[in-house]
């Protein structure tokens, strides 16, 4: 069963469901900080959010997309002139969830700094590339994967199959346009590359124009990385 039509994603067990809160997947350490207002208890995600960092470390589905969009809009309302950082380690996911986050990133006023840690695959690769030009980064051993949307729709009335096929073609065209807009690679080359999985090292992603720099330590780039 395909849970996300047109995305190539399949059903997962509850234990694997990445849209669930982090606390339901594993134990997150909490720490206490003394402030002028008293004692505050944090988890790492809350602390990162306070520092204007959004960590996208899950599959991109409707639940995680809503979380990211809410954080983007909240951080914009708190200070529309300060950058927002999005750290990415994601296997990708739903195309509609991707476009929801993508449009919100383009909509908000703050610059969006994107950093790939681990992997930015499929939909996550688009989000990595969609950061503000000059502020898109990857760690040295990160990898980026791009490919075309796909679907396993194989049954139903002919008219339904035709509708599904046309939607896949529309999504592919939209994906190609996004990659062309946010990279230095010609769209003709992109069309050829996404016929199959295209795996890029950090160096390859830099050459492709999906990122602007490779960073290995904060010491070299304190002003750029939140």
From Swiss-Prot:
It is found in: Cytoplasm. It comes from the Bacteria. Disulfide bonds: none annotated. It catalyses: Hydrolysis of proteins to small peptides in the presence of ATP and magnesium. alpha-casein is the usual test substrate. In the absence of ATP, only oligopeptides shorter than five residues are hydrolyzed (such as succinyl-Leu-Tyr-|-NHMec, and Leu-Tyr-Leu-|-Tyr-Trp, in which cleavage of the -Tyr-|-Leu- and -Tyr-|-Trp bonds also occurs). The keyword Oxidoreductase does not apply. GO terms for molecular function: ATP-dependent peptidase activity; ATPase binding; serine-type endopeptidase activity. One of its GO terms (biological process) is protein quality control for misfolded or incompletely synthesized proteins. Its EC number is 3.4.21.92. Belongs to the peptidase S14 family. This is ATP-dependent Clp protease proteolytic subunit 4.
């Amino acid at each position: 069963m395909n849970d996300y039509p047109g995305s190539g994603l399949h059903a997962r067990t509850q234990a694997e469901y990445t849209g669930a809160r982090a606390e339901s997947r594993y134990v997150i350490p909490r720490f206490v900080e003394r402030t002028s207002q008293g004692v505050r208890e944090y988890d790492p995600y809350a602390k990162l959010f306070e520092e204007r960092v959004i960590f996208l470390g899950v599959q991109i589905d409707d639940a995680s997309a809503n979380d990211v969009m809410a954080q983007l809009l909240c951080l914009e309302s708190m200070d529309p002139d300060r950058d927002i950082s999005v750290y990415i380690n994601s296997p990708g996911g739903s195309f509609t969830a991707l476009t929801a986050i993508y449009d919100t990133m383009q909509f908000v006023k703050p610059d969006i700094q994107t950093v790939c840690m681990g992997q930015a695959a499929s939909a996550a690769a688009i989000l990595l590339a969609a950061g503000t030009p000059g502020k898109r980064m990857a760690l040295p051993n990160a990898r980026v994967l791009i490919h075309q949307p796909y679907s396993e729709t194989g049954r139903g009335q002919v008219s339904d199959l035709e509708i599904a096929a046309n939607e896949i073609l529309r999504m592919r065209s939209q994906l190609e346009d996004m990659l062309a807009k946010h990279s230095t690679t010609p769209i003709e080359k992109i069309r050829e590359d996404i016929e199959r999985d295209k795996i890029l090292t950090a160096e390859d992603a830099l050459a492709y124009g999906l990122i602007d720099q490779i960073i290995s330590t904060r010491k070299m780039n304190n002003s750029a990385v939140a």
